[in-house]
Protein backbone atom coordinates (compact mmCIF):
# COMPACT_ATOMS: atom_id res chain seq x y z
CA UNK A 1 0.00 0.00 0.00
CA UNK A 2 1.92 3.03 -1.24
CA UNK A 3 -0.75 5.33 0.20
CA UNK A 4 0.86 4.94 3.64
CA UNK A 5 4.20 6.38 2.53
CA UNK A 6 2.39 9.09 0.56
CA UNK A 7 0.37 10.13 3.60
CA UNK A 8 3.44 10.03 5.85
CA UNK A 9 5.04 12.52 3.46
CA UNK A 10 1.91 14.69 3.40
CA UNK A 11 1.80 14.83 7.21
CA UNK A 12 5.52 15.61 7.35
CA UNK A 13 5.06 18.53 4.92
CA UNK A 14 1.95 19.79 6.73
CA UNK A 15 3.63 19.69 10.15
CA UNK A 16 6.81 21.35 8.90
CA UNK A 17 4.83 24.08 7.14
CA UNK A 18 2.78 24.69 10.29
CA UNK A 19 5.96 24.96 12.39
CA UNK A 20 7.60 27.34 9.91
CA UNK A 21 4.57 29.60 10.15
CA UNK A 22 4.35 29.55 13.95
CA UNK A 23 1.14 27.51 14.08
CA UNK A 24 0.43 25.28 17.04
CA UNK A 25 -2.33 23.25 15.45
CA UNK A 26 -3.59 22.26 12.02
CA UNK A 27 -7.39 22.39 11.67
CA UNK A 28 -7.78 21.02 8.16
CA UNK A 29 -5.89 19.70 5.16
CA UNK A 30 -7.18 19.64 1.58
CA UNK A 31 -5.59 17.41 -1.04
CA UNK A 32 -6.03 17.29 -4.80
CA UNK A 33 -5.88 13.70 -6.02
CA UNK A 34 -6.15 12.95 -9.73
CA UNK A 35 -8.43 10.13 -10.83
CA UNK A 36 -5.57 8.80 -12.99
CA UNK A 37 -2.96 8.97 -10.21
CA UNK A 38 -3.38 5.34 -9.10
CA UNK A 39 -3.97 6.59 -5.55
CA UNK A 40 -6.96 5.20 -3.68
CA UNK A 41 -8.76 7.99 -1.75
CA UNK A 42 -10.22 5.53 0.79
CA UNK A 43 -6.76 4.16 1.50
CA UNK A 44 -5.44 7.72 1.90
CA UNK A 45 -8.14 8.45 4.48
CA UNK A 46 -7.32 5.24 6.36
CA UNK A 47 -3.61 6.07 6.37
CA UNK A 48 -4.30 9.67 7.40
CA UNK A 49 -6.07 8.42 10.51
CA UNK A 50 -3.03 6.29 11.35
CA UNK A 51 -0.22 8.81 10.80
CA UNK A 52 -1.64 12.10 12.09
CA UNK A 53 -1.76 11.06 15.77
CA UNK A 54 0.80 12.74 17.99
CA UNK A 55 1.41 15.57 15.52
CA UNK A 56 0.14 19.15 15.25
CA UNK A 57 -2.36 17.72 12.74
CA UNK A 58 -3.75 15.28 15.31
CA UNK A 59 -7.30 16.68 15.16
CA UNK A 60 -7.22 18.04 11.61
CA UNK A 61 -9.89 17.09 9.13
CA UNK A 62 -8.96 15.79 5.69
CA UNK A 63 -10.75 16.72 2.48
CA UNK A 64 -9.88 15.03 -0.81
CA UNK A 65 -10.78 16.77 -4.06
CA UNK A 66 -10.79 14.43 -7.05
CA UNK A 67 -9.29 15.96 -10.20
CA UNK A 68 -10.67 14.69 -13.51
CA UNK A 69 -8.39 13.32 -16.20
CA UNK A 70 -7.72 15.71 -19.04
CA UNK A 71 -5.35 15.83 -21.97
CA UNK A 72 -4.31 17.74 -25.07
CA UNK A 73 -4.73 15.86 -28.33
CA UNK A 74 -1.70 16.54 -30.50
CA UNK A 75 -3.58 15.49 -33.64
CA UNK A 76 -6.86 17.40 -33.41
CA UNK A 77 -5.60 20.17 -31.10
CA UNK A 78 -8.37 19.85 -28.52
CA UNK A 79 -8.44 19.58 -24.77
CA UNK A 80 -10.29 16.35 -24.03
CA UNK A 81 -11.47 14.33 -21.04
CA UNK A 82 -9.38 11.24 -20.30
CA UNK A 83 -10.86 8.16 -18.68
CA UNK A 84 -7.56 6.25 -18.58
CA UNK A 85 -3.84 6.87 -18.90
CA UNK A 86 -2.66 6.67 -22.49
CA UNK A 87 -6.28 6.61 -23.66
CA UNK A 88 -7.40 7.59 -27.12
CA UNK A 89 -8.76 11.02 -27.94
CA UNK A 90 -12.56 10.75 -27.71
CA UNK A 91 -12.88 13.07 -30.73
CA UNK A 92 -10.42 11.70 -33.30
CA UNK A 93 -9.63 8.26 -31.82
CA UNK A 94 -5.86 8.67 -31.97
CA UNK A 95 -3.56 7.95 -29.05
CA UNK A 96 -1.36 11.04 -29.24
CA UNK A 97 -2.84 12.67 -26.15
CA UNK A 98 -0.62 14.44 -23.65
CA UNK A 99 -2.07 14.26 -20.14
CA UNK A 100 -2.53 17.71 -18.60
CA UNK A 101 -4.56 16.86 -15.48
CA UNK A 102 -5.66 13.91 -13.44
CA UNK A 103 -2.37 12.38 -12.30
CA UNK A 104 -1.58 14.84 -9.51
CA UNK A 105 -1.35 14.39 -5.77
CA UNK A 106 -0.78 17.69 -4.02
CA UNK A 107 -1.62 19.60 -0.90
CA UNK A 108 -4.08 22.27 -2.03
CA UNK A 109 -4.14 24.11 1.28
CA UNK A 110 -4.32 23.77 5.02
CA UNK A 111 -5.88 25.75 7.84
CA UNK A 112 -3.78 26.38 10.93
CA UNK A 113 -4.16 28.14 14.26
Curated annotation (Swiss-Prot):
Keywords, ordered alphabetically: Metal-binding, Nickel, Zinc
UniProt-annotated binding residues for Zn(2+): 73, 76, 89, 92
Keyword Zinc in record: yes
Binding-site residues, Ni(2+): 2
InterPro entries: Hydgase_Ni_incorp_HypA/HybF_CS, HypA/HybF
Gene Ontology MF term list: nickel cation binding; zinc ion binding
Pfam family, one: HypA
GO biological process, one term: protein maturation
HAMAP family named in the record: HypA_HybF
Annotated PANTHER family: HYDROGENASE MATURATION FACTOR HYPA
Family: Belongs to the HypA/HybF family.
Job description of the protein: Involved in the maturation of [NiFe] hydrogenases. Required for nickel insertion into the metal center of the hydrogenase.
Protein name: Hydrogenase maturation factor HypA
Amino acid sequence: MHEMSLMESVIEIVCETARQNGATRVKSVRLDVGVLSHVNPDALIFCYEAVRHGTVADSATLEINRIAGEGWCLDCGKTVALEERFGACPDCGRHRVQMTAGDELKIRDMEVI
